[in-house]
Regions:
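C-terminal catalytic "cap/lid" subdomain
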Residues: 1-168
C-alpha cells in the first residue's frame, strides 16, 4: 500500500494464506528497510502483546423481568433483536439471570434498546472502549488496568478483554 495503511485486514491476508503466498510488508516511512514477512514457515507464536482498542462502545445488560425462567431461554430473542437492529457485538457475557453485550455505538442502538426494554429490564453504559490484549501476562494486565474504570473483564490463558470507561 502506498497510502500508509497501518492495519492489514484479515480479508487481505486470508487468500494469500490459503494459497501459501508470503506477504512482504515494508514500513511506509522507510520503504528500503527490511520490513516483515507474513508467511507459513513454522515460526512459533510471537511473545509480544498486541493491544486492540475499539472505541465508542456501549455495554447493554439485560435481565429477565420474570425470574421464574432462566435467561438462557431468551437468548434467541435477544440476538434476533440485536440482528434486526444491525448491532455489531464485540463481546458477550452471560450469567444465570443476565446477559451483557458490548456493541458499537451506532444510530441503531436507541431503537434496539427500546425494543429490548419491552421484554427485559435493560441497563446500559455509554462512552466505553473495549481493550483486547492478545499475548497478555498478569503483569501486562495489571498495567493495562491501572487508572481505568473497568465495567467488565474477561480473561483467558493469553487474551484479556476489558470494557473500560473512555477517558477524556
Amino acid at each position: 500500500s502506498y497510502s500508509g495503511a497501518q492495519v492489514i485486514h484479515p480479508k487481505t491476508i486470508r487468500p494469500l494464506e490459503n494459497k501459501r503466498i508470503p506477504l512482504l510488508v515494508k514500513p511506509f516511512g522507510d520503504p528500503t528497510a527490511e520490513g516483515s514477512r507474513i508467511a507459513e514457515d513454522g515460526v512459533g507464536p510471537i511473545n509480544v502483546p498486541v493491544y486492540i482498542w475499539r472505541k465508542n462502545q456501549i455495554l447493554i445488560t439485560m435481565r429477565a423481568k420474570d425470574f421464574a425462567f432462566a435467561l438462557e431461554s431468551s437468548l434467541s430473542e435477544i440476538f434476533e433483536i440485536i440482528h434486526h437492529h444491525r448491532l455489531k457485538v464485540s463481546l458477550i457475557q452471560s450469567s444465570a439471570v443476565t446477559i451483557s453485550v458490548c456493541v458499537d455505538n451506532t444510530r441503531f442502538v436507541p431503537e434496539a434498546i427500546a425494543e429490548l426494554q419491552k421484554h427485559f429490564n435493560v441497563t446500559y453504559n455509554e462512552n466505553l472502549s473495549l481493550l483486547t490484549i492478545r499475548g497478555t501476562t498478569p503483569e501486562i494486565l495489571e498495567k493495562a488496568k491501572a487508572g481505568k474504570t473497568i465495567m467488565l473483564s474477561q480473561t483467558t490463558r493469553r487474551t484479556a478483554r476489558l470494557v473500560v470507561v473512555e477517558q477524556a
